Amino acid sequence: EEGITAYCLTGAYGMPSPTITGSVEKDIMMVPPIIGTKIAVSDHRSSNPRGEELIAIGSATRRGGMLANVAGLVTMHMGSGVGKLDPLFYALDHSDIPAKNFLPTHMLRTHDLMEEGAKLVRRGGYFDMTAGSTDEDMELGAEKIMEILSWEGMSTDHLTMSSDAFGSQPKFNAQGECIGLTYCSPKYLHLTIKSLVRRGLALEEAIKLLTSTPAEMLGKAGIKG
């Protein structure tokens, strides 16, 4: 009734990807809400996939997407590991998979990831940024977004923002031990847009992060967003 459309991804942090039908490609083809695959990269909770593994999962995801007429997007949970986007750039350099078929997320996690994301955008890709889980995190994230938009070749046409809302948010101590779980709120999407506008970004540009740019990336331009 409210016009909300929901999609989902097959896979998980680990590889090989858990699936419903036995393969990533079949999941995307046979299960209508599935539009892509989820993996984790450069994170201590991932399977530490390398470039060749990204080529394999990217190829299967793209094929499934083409056959099902959906985005065929590999959403990459990015950690703060030393590998950064190296496996992705290897995949792009050693295959014919377009950059737009990979979406790294949590890209405000480190400044190195922000810079790597800018390189990806300059190659025709997109990257996603996570709205904060606290007021302080949200304001820091807005500041980082404004910095990114000041860089050459960067615009809201290739950046998206999501909230991780109601997904688990682990808390780690200084030794890297998980000491608890919480969750993020979707309210920080709205609050981040307000903060960006207060910082001087035009409203029509700020809301692209949540509307037309995700729609374009998902192949839904003119339908959603």
Give the positions of each predicted feature:
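Generic structural signal for hydrophobic
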Residues: 1, 117-120, 196
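Active-site loop-helix segments enriched in His/Asp/Glu that coordinate
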Residues: 1-64, 78, 85-90
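Residue-level detector of anion-binding/catalytic polar loops
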Residues: 5, 126, 202
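Conserved beta-strand edge residues that scaffold enzyme active sites
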Residues: 13-14, 134, 210
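Short Asp/Glu-rich motifs
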Residues: 17-20, 139-140, 215-216
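Short, electropositive alpha-helical surface patch
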Residues: 24-32, 91-95, 99, 183, ...
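Active-site core of metal-dependent hydrolases
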Residues: 43-172, 177-179
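His/Asp/Glu-enriched, well-ordered alpha-helical/loop segment
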Residues: 151-225
